[in-house]
Amino acid sequence: MAPTKKVPQVPETVLKRRKQRADARTKAAQHKVTVAAKNKEKKTQYFKRAEKYVQEYRNAQKEGLRLKREAEAKGDFYVPAEHKVAFVVRIRGINQLHPKPRKALQILRLRQINNGVFVKLNKATLPLLRIIEPYVAWGYPNNKTIHDLLYKRGYAKVDGNRVPITDNTIVEQSLGKFNIICLEDLAHEIATVGPHFKEATNFLWPFKLNNPTGGWTKKTNHFVEGGDFGNREDQINNLLRKMV
């Protein structure tokens, strides 16, 4: 009878490595499933928030229309609520610039031509806008304009660096503590001038826009005189469509 051959034993270190690799694969698979579930949950949350904001906007429009009709029926004038937020674009350079408007432009972070920022309209900012008026075009952005600026031209300030807002994670990491976790939240906070408007706008790097399609008309004249500078109220939306 032939002697039985011994099956060579697998070294213990090899077995340990195999187990470690198997455990690692299992953990990686579990992590992948967990991340996918969290991402799905977040996407649902983003969608619900966006829906909620759209409904709020529509309700506000309907209410405004109702009040206008009610006033007209009584023979009165309808006075809409005062605008709370402006978008300001620098349109002129620094040649022969007086120190006072230069300082005001720096305060508003409008350091270069075609830089743009959102500004909360109040007793502190309105005097600044009057000082810099010959050097800027400004007005009242609507919801669509705010969305277009954020989605097409939005950059964040992260650790002093200009970072493109490629996904909602960037927003959540910086503003999650204020319950602003996505671009829709950011747009809503700006449009409504929410309690964390300052944090929201400081998170954004000043927008860098193009010259308007077709060019400027006359930068040294006020908008009401057929020029470019100054408050153009709702017409700022037409200008920004040409610059985004």
Swiss-Prot record:
What cellular component terms from Gene Ontology apply here? cytosolic large ribosomal subunit
What single Pfam family name could you report for this chain, choosing any that match? Answer: Ribosomal_L30
- Keyword Ribonucleoprotein found: yes
Q: Which portions of the sequence form the region Disordered?
A: 1-37
Q: Name one GO biological process term.
A: maturation of LSU-rRNA from tricistronic rRNA transcript (SSU-rRNA, 5.8S rRNA, LSU-rRNA)
Q: Which InterPro entries match?
A: Ribo_uL30_ferredoxin-like_sf (IPR036919), Ribosomal_uL30 (IPR039699), Ribosomal_uL30_CS (IPR018038), Ribosomal_uL30_euk (IPR005998), Ribosomal_uL30_euk_arc (IPR035808), Ribosomal_uL30_ferredoxin-like (IPR016082), Ribosomal_uL30_N_euk (IPR012988)
Keywords recorded for this protein, A-Z: Ribonucleoprotein, Ribosomal protein, RNA-binding
UniProt lists the family membership as follows: Belongs to the universal ribosomal protein uL30 family.
Give the protein's recorded name.
Large ribosomal subunit protein uL30
This chain's source organism reads Caenorhabditis elegans
Which gene holds the coding sequence for this protein?
rpl-7
